[in-house]
Structures are given as C-alpha cells and as structure tokens.
C-alpha cells in the first residue's frame, strides 16, 4: 500500500453553527496545499468555501452534508470529514461520527459552549471519539479562551487543559505561546504561512509557567515516567506529548488550542496536534455485527490482506451519477473486485474508485484499512456494509426504527410532481428512517419519519434542491389497534353466482399475543379443511389485520388458531377460504374488545436548572410520565415518556418556556393503550370521515 497506517488520521471538525468550522476546514486545506486561494464562507468574491459544495450551504453559509477531503500535513495523511453543524441534521452527524477516529471540537471564543456544542459533544461521547478542542475567533471583541476552557470543564465535564496561551487578544492577537516547547509562535507573511519562533514575552512568562504546570500535572496521571521527571524538573517535550496523547485517546484529557482561522493564526500547530494527539486507525476498536451469528459483535482488524469490510456512509447525487463515500475498516478495496452488500444481499463489481478532495476527485486503484474513498454508480443505500469473500457483517445494526409520524404532500403542479418523486427517491435512499408511499384510498403521497422536525428538513430540501413546491397536510400519528381478550369465531362464506360458487367455513378463536404482531396456529384434524387451503386461511387473516375496524389502523399482537371448518368439493377455492378467514376475523374482532394503541416517545430534555419546574409542567400537560431527572452543574436533564400526539409543535413551546436555552431529543419507545377519552374522539373522527367518503 505504501501508506503508513500509523501516520493516518480520520478526523471530523465538529462545532456549533457559526463557530467558524468551515473557515477552519478551508485553512487546513490551504496550509496542506490543497487550494491556492482562500475563500470566506460568506465571501465578497461570490465564491463560497471549498468544503461547502451544496448550493444551499453556500447561500446560507452553513454546512449540511459532510464532504470528505484528503490532505497531507508533514508526514501525515489526514482525511477531513466536514460534519453538519445544525441539530436538525443529526443523522448526517451520527453517520460521519461512525467513520471518524478523532475530532476537533471547534468553539467560539466569545460564545463559548453553546447548546449545540453540548449536542455535538454528547454524540462524540456516545461514539467514543477522542477529541482536541480549538477555541476559534480569538481576534473578536470579547474573546476569552480561558472562560471557554472553564465552560468545557463545567458544562461538558471534559478534563480540558490549555496547550497554548494567546499573545494578545481581540484585535491585538499576534500569536500563541506553546506550553510544551515554551516558545512564542508568531504567524507572519501573507496568509500567516511563515511561523516565527521567539522567546516568550516577559509579561506572559508567569502565566505560561502556571498553565504549563497545570497541564503537565494533569498529564502525569497517564505517565509514571513523566511524573518522576516532572518532580526533578527533567521532563522532555516527547514525554509530555506521549502522556497527553495517552490521556486524549482514553477520552480522559482534552488538549485546548487557540487561534483565529479567519486571521490565519494558530492553524499549523493545530495540524501538528492532530498528528501528536489524535488516534490512527489501529488505535480505535471498530466492531461489526455478524449477521450469520444473530448480530454477534466482531472486532475488526486493520490487516490489509484480510477480507474487505467497508461502510458506505454518505450518498451524493453528482453530475456523474450516484457517488458513495466509503470508509474501509479492514482489507483492501480494489478496483474491479467483487463485493457483497450485506443489507441488499447483492453482489456488485467495484467500477470506478476515486478519492474526493471536496468537489474535485482523483482516480485511484485501491483503498486500504482506514482509507476513505468513493465509489461510482453503485446502487445502495446510506449505511450499507460492503464485504469481501464469505463475510456477512454489518457495521451497524440492521434495525431501523419504524416511522411514527406521517404527513401528506400535494405538489402544486405537474412539474412539481415529477421533481417530488425524484426527491423522495433520493431522500429515502439517503436516510433509512425517512419513508414515502402513495395512499391507495386518497391517492395522496405520504411521507413518514421520526418527528416533526425530521420531515420539515426534507420538505425544505425539496424546495431548495429540486425547486419543488408542495403543500403539506396535518401531521398524522401512526396508531395501532389490538384485541384485549379471547373471542371465538365460526364463519361460513357462501356465494352463488351461476356456475361454480364460493364456499368455505372456518372456526377457531383469536387471542392477544405479546411476542409478535401476528401468529397463526393450525389445529385442524381429520381434513375438515383440505391442507391446500390452510395457506389461504393464513393469507386471509393477514389481510384482515391490515386495517382494524375502530379507526382503520393495522392490528397488532394477535394470535389466530383454527380448529375446525368445512369445504365443498366444487365451490371451495383459494379465494373462498381467504374470504371466509377475513369474515371470521371481523366477526371475532368485535367480541375481543379491541383497543387503540398510541406511539409513546422517549423524550429527553436538557436545560438550565432554573427552568426545571417549567420543563416538568410541559411534560405533565402532555400526559407525560417522568422517568428520571438528573442535575449536574446548573444543568438538568429530564427523561420522560410522552404520547407522540401531544408532541406536535413542542420545539416552539419549549423554546419560549426556557428562553431558548433548553433542547430536546425524542425517539420511539413503545405502543401504549390510549385513554378512553382519546379513543372515543379518534373513533368519532374516523366514523365521520367514512360517512363523508360514502357521500
């Protein structure tokens, strides 16, 4: 391969919106010699930053889709994955985090740790991504990197230590003092490309000494050698770096760097830090799930000769067709080789293999462990795993939660209708939690997803990317129906229409079952129903549970047992027994006391402690049950279970009740029985709708 894997870094730049993330990516590309002119995100020259290559991102100066770019810095190869900063795009962020080995957490030296920094940090913790922090915008009025360091400790609970201190702040920012080498660094020349090393200015010496001792003292936790040397005043730069690296990889130490990407100060030492302190692909344990062994976890190696395991983490519609970004975990992915998509259970051939540098690409022949490459023209979905010979692994669980909310879409005109189907086709491939279908009865297009916000993002993207104007209906909750007791049936289906008629009788009972949505048990003895018609009965029952009679939603948790029946030598047929089963089920269903089930969501709300009372109030007003509430450092986190139907418009209400300082996340937990008052209302609405349709 020629690439030394220990010199390879896969990093993401994670941040709150507007903390200067894209500008930092741009500078990294510049100093690593990837682009020859610098562009600002909202530049005067009308050329947006290189990493933001989706039109909408350029226009709004935010980053939505993660582009990946490979750069060389000294003897390191660095893949920079630009992650979205908006909370609404968290599926993108989480996907990017799967493929990162380390991250740079960017913070604004004025704004500090903001609500979204908390979300991003929580995701980094969940995926165990070691990080270094960069306090950006130190040239701005009100800049205070020391305050930001304290917030990293207090709000995020990170063991953060300064690796540098600033030489001047705001418009007097000249450079930084490196606390490892105890030298001052000034960034000079056009675009700050020349670094001048000098002695530390006299007035900063005491501060430098203080912060250096703090940092080394913390690093001695990870190195006995450093602890001994420090006591004797004999510590070396190598010892300090080795200890800080060890702490960072264990996620127990966060080195803090600072500068101003816009003013080209502090970027080169940050790039050095990526090499010094962030992990190479061999230092991170990646696990796959063995689908042949009931999703048993398997630890992947980084052997280039092992069978290939790779993850397609990002799809893009380019001018040359679908582009799939892939992270190789083990083995070598070669052009022309055959791979197996474990979700689609399909083999495919690797045609063109490229390496992306933001929007330009170079053709390559192979990619080894730790590499990030892109494939052309492969039909796959985001999150698919590609394996080499005889492996059936998935990088993430095949479990995709069922959507809990749906919305009808009506295109404004014929052109919008064409664009809408293109957009939906692409979005459903990109995001496994987003689905769409056409409702047979109303002939409307329905989209489904994990929450209100989730669907809003896609409607917005349709307008922008596909110039497609749609009208949206009211959000609909995915209810279910279920029986609550056993009921018997004995039903005869008889139809005489000249020629051969239809005849079939089925008898048995239905009862609730908790293990699965539907179970069929055949207890027929002595051929009361001929064996060739048993599957017809099963088919009929399956058809019957698709729509309940209370409010027309699917029926879950039902076991059907048949134990008797009757057939006719001429008039019995597949269709006759299907019809008999449907009739039998409907007859028993009314007697089995059916109930309506509603989706219950697990809601987590985080916000300042002073709003805890308001948060409890909001949950109680929504028929919610508080499961736990924890406090740490002026912050409160409340976990609750709340019916989805009560959560519409919640983000706006939460913002106004907490001065915009709280945020929430929500995921599907379970189905629960709807209270009688709610059920009665739903049944009334359904009956009124049916009456209106008949007219």
Curated annotation (Swiss-Prot):
CDD domains: EF-G (cd01886), EFG_III (cd16262), EFG_mtEFG1_IV (cd01434), mtEFG1_II_like (cd04091)
Residue ranges of every copy of the tr-type G domain listed in the record: 6-282
Source superkingdom: Bacteria
Protein residues bound to GTP: 15-22, 82-86, 136-139
Keyword GTP-binding tagged: yes
UniProt GO MF annotations: GTP binding; GTPase activity; translation elongation factor activity
InterPro entries linked to this entry: EFG_II, EFG_III, EFG_III/V, EFG_IV, EFG_V-like, EFTu-like_2, G_TR_CS, P-loop_NTPase
Location within or outside the cell: Cytoplasm
Record-level GO cellular component terms: cytoplasm
Keywords: Cytoplasm, Elongation factor, GTP-binding, Nucleotide-binding, Protein biosynthesis
Summary of the function given for this chain in its UniProt record: Catalyzes the GTP-dependent ribosomal translocation step during translation elongation. During this step, the ribosome changes from the pre-translocational (PRE) to the post-translocational (POST) state as the newly formed A-site-bound peptidyl-tRNA and P-site-bound deacylated tRNA move to the P and E sites, respectively. Catalyzes the coordinated movement of the two tRNA molecules, the mRNA and conformational changes in the ribosome.
PANTHER family associated with the record: ELONGATION FACTOR G, MITOCHONDRIAL (PTHR43636:SF2)
HAMAP family: EF_G_EF_2_B
NCBIfam families: EF-G, PRK12740.1-5, small_GTP
Protein family according to the UniProt entry: Belongs to the TRAFAC class translation factor GTPase superfamily. Classic translation factor GTPase family. EF-G/EF-2 subfamily.
Protein name per Swiss-Prot or TrEMBL: Elongation factor G 2
Source species taxonomy: Bacteria, Pseudomonadati, Spirochaetota, Spirochaetia, Spirochaetales
Annotated gene: fusA2
